[in-house]
Amino acid sequence: IDSWGATLDYPERFDQQGTNDVTGFLSASYGIAELERLFGWQRIRDHAADLAAYAASIIAPALETLQDVPARPHVGMAQPAQPLLRLPDGIVTDGASQRALKNRLSAEADVEAGIMVWRGQGFLRISAHAYNVAADYEQFVERGIPVIASMARSGASHSPAR
């Protein structure tokens, strides 16, 4: 479905707020039902959990080469499809350094990553869904870990945000 502003000239066509379009609300129940019909939600959940476990099994050891503590922290309510991994100390300490790492991973490694900070410690949130494949996480190890390693070596937690 095209945007309500698709027929407008540039730049006006981009002034339309997609949040005012209720198409998502109208179609969500059909999408949910179709995924159940095609694959089944249990199969999707199992795939996501298995894939996230695989991702953690290859990303955690790579992160552990950069730090003296385990990359897998104890969490109260672990989510099978979204494991949390500890980043090396000092890389992400606040919102600015969180955005800096996220931006560097995007610009230099061409990956999008869930980076968060809690009590001055940075974490990587692995997220897996039906559309993800093992190669997504293998590419993160290949391209994303060197960016994190570079930041760990430099000790700099801040870089210019884009």
Where are these regions (language model features)?
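Pyridoxal 5′-phosphate
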Residues: 1-162
